[in-house]
Regions:
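Short helix-boundary/capping micro-motifs
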Residues: 12-28, 54
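Central regulatory/effector-binding core of bacterial HTH transcription factors
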Residues: 90-153, 224
Length: 305
């Protein structure tokens, strides 16, 4: 039994006219009659009564019409969904992100992606970098937005999607709070609150590398697993820290960000997926995100600092 036979049958069942149906589906009337005859042979019953004056459905034809219409609708839906899935426009995306990009970068991309891919379902989770790496490698996460750098021996394909400067973060009552720019040597010997290495080793080592290059050994009074918590610790007077500028901008804590005059690396967010064969929906989202974030970067004004 072929789909074209069922479609032809349903069209005749609606028009009750072989000639009119043949015109509608752009098929010769003899060819249409052959399709229906083959369908009746497969069903094992006559579906139409025909004479010179009219065409009508038999009892078998009425029963077949109702079920065939429902079956055809389901099959056409299955075909449509299969094509969407093959083109990366259907499926579920499990996305992880570090807290500092969860409120801005990820929601914007997801919202824009859903406009042209409404049948993709999302599961969004705030996950620390080290756990994201493990989940991506095990296949329990599809896309991760994490802190760079990630180890070169990783089984992940990582692309930098966001860059911003590090700033020195001090309490609003600190002696440097009124300074717009500082050199790191000016804070040598002061207490620092720092990021724990376990949860983002590459990012932790990057921060300590900044101090090492400035020939400073920070006196660490407290550690935290998330950067927003570091900012809160700074506000409470536990110490000072360095952090990405956007974290301070989005914080309500009573802290001040001072630009760092030393030549230091930028803070980077990477978008990570597993290397190798991936679900089409993952590749579709990744390509869309790279294009979208690329346009956003190109539209930003030049940094004049």
């Amino acid at each position: 039994m072929e789909l074209r036979q069922i479609r032809s049958f349903l069209s005749i069942a609606e028009t009750l006219h072989f000639g009119r149906t043949a015109e509608l589906i752009h098929l010769s009337q003899p060819a249409l009659s052959l399709q229906i005859r083959a369908l009746e042979e497969e069903v094992g019953a006559r579906l139409f009564e025909r004479n010179r004056r009219k065409t009508s459905l038999t009892a078998a034809g009425v029963a077949f019409r109702d079920d065939a219409a429902a079956a055809l609708s389901q099959l056409e839906q299955a075909i449509r969904r299969a094509r969407l899935a093959a083109n990366g426009k259907l499926g579920q995306l499990r996305i992880g992100f570090v807290s500092t990009v969860g409120s801005e970068i990820v929601p914007n991309i997801v919202r824009q992606f859903r406009k042209s891919n409404p049948e993709v379902e999302f599961s969004l989770r705030n996950i620390l970098t080290a756990e994201q790496v493990q989940m991506l490698e095990s296949g329990s996460l599809d896309v991760g937005f994490l802190r760079m750098p990630v180890g070169e021996d990783s089984a992940l394909d990582v692309v930098t999607v966001h860059r911003e400067p590090f700033v020195l973060v001090v309490p609003s009552s600190h002696k440097l709070a009124k300074r717009k720019r500082v050199r790191l040597r000016e804070v040598a010997g002061q207490d620092f609150v720092m990021y724990e290495r376990t949860y983002a080793p590459g990012f932790h080592d990057l921060m300590y590398g900044i101090f090492r290059d400035a020939r400073i050994a920070p006196n660490v009074s407290q550690t935290a697993v998330e950067i927003p918590m570091l900012i809160s610790l700074v506000a409470s007077g536990m110490g000072i820290t360095i952090a990405p500028l956007s974290v301070v901008k989005h914080s309500a804590a009573s802290v001040v960000a001072c630009n760092i005059l030393d030549r230091i690396p930028m803070s980077e967010i990477g978008m990570a997926v597993r290397k190798g064969t991936r679900a089409p929906v993952v590749d579709n989202f990744r390509s869309f995100a790279l294009k979208t974030l690329g346009r956003a970067r190109n539209s930003l004004p030049a940094d004049r600092s």
